[in-house]
């Protein structure tokens, strides 16, 4: 079966790991905090590298960016230097990741107006995340996210939106039980949805350690196959070609690991595996009861059902 092929190449820069939301499953949880002025100057320098001309899309990711992270005037000034530089460059698309669990008026609105004034709003993709459990630890947080999504739709319709959802066991349960309709959610949010496999990240040693903290975070293989049959084969609410493709992710990312910038140079190659600087961190993905990858299971099911 053919995988989804991205029409362009995408370079992404992590600014920092700082974020107040405190998701227990976050792959950046409790990472070493980096000096934000150093990080922003590092990215300004990287944007001068000739390598950027290999890519026609660019992205910025935290941590979080627009909650309290750029409160300090010097940090904010440097952040806007980065944005100004990006806006002046050759990039056809600009990805900006944010959790949307904060007061938009503090920083995000100013940033969106800045991007509008630069005339790049049609290039910008606001990337956020939704999860059935552990992300919204209070009802207030969920309401804030939903309110901000509605506000983006009404006040900033010229900015496209994108949502990532982790294929956790909990999420799959809500879908299989009929408590969450993927197609309706996408329509309600007016946003493209992509699904990513759960990972133990840079904080936990392995899947079992994270599963003990967030029960049902990693799905069983059997449960995932039921989800595939229902949502990919029968309802076609999920594009299986994207599930088995690394090309929905950035091609190259400057990622923080143990307080250091690490270049993940070709994340779209088949079989790409994140390797942590801390040898105890396995960065495991997939199922709690199998070492098979989500990709392998998707392909095997498609072959068995002769699905194109």
PLM regions with names:
Residues 6-14, 240-252, 281-291:
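Short, intrinsically disordered, charge-biased short linear motifs at domain edges
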Residues 45-52, 81-87, 114-118, 184-185:
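Leucine-rich repeat
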């Amino acid at each position: 079966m053919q995988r989804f092929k991205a029409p362009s190449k995408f370079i992404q820069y992590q600014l920092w790991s700082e974020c107040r939301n405190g998701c227990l499953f976050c792959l950046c949880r409790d990472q070493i905090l980096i000096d934000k002025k150093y990080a922003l100057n590092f990215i300004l320098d990287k944007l001068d590298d000739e390598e950027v001309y290999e890519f026609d899309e660019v992205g910025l990711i935290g941590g979080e960016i627009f909650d309290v992270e750029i409160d300090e005037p010097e940090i904010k000034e440097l952040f806007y230097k980065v944005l100004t530089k990006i806006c002046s460059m050759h990039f056809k698309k600009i990805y900006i990741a944010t959790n949307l669990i904060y007061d938009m008026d503090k920083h995000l609105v100013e940033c969106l107006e800045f991007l509008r004034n630069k005339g790049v709003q049609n290039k910008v993709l606001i990337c956020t995340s939704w999860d059935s459990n552990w992300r919204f630890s209070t009802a207030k947080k969920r309401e804030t996210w939903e309110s901000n999504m509605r506000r983006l739709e009404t006040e900033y319709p010229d900015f496209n939106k994108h949502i990532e959802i982790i294929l956790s066991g909990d999420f799959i349960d809500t879908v299989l039980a009929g408590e969450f309709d993927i197609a309706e959610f996408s329509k309600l949010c007016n946003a493209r949805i992509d699904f990513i496999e759960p990972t133990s990240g840079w904080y936990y040693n392995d899947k079992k350690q994270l599963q003990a903290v967030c029960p049902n975070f990693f799905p069983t293989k059997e449960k995932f196959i039921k989800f595939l049959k229902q949502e990919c084969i029968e309802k076609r609410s999920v594009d299986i070609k994207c599930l088995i493709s690394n090309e929905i992710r950035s091609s190259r990312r400057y990622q923080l690991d143990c307080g250091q910038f690490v270049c993940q140079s070709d994340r779209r190659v088949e079989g790409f595996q994140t390797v942590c600087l801390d040898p105890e961190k396995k960065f495991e993905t997939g199922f709690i009861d199998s070492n098979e990858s989500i990709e392998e299971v998707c392909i095997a099911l498609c072959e068995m059902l002769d699905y194109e």
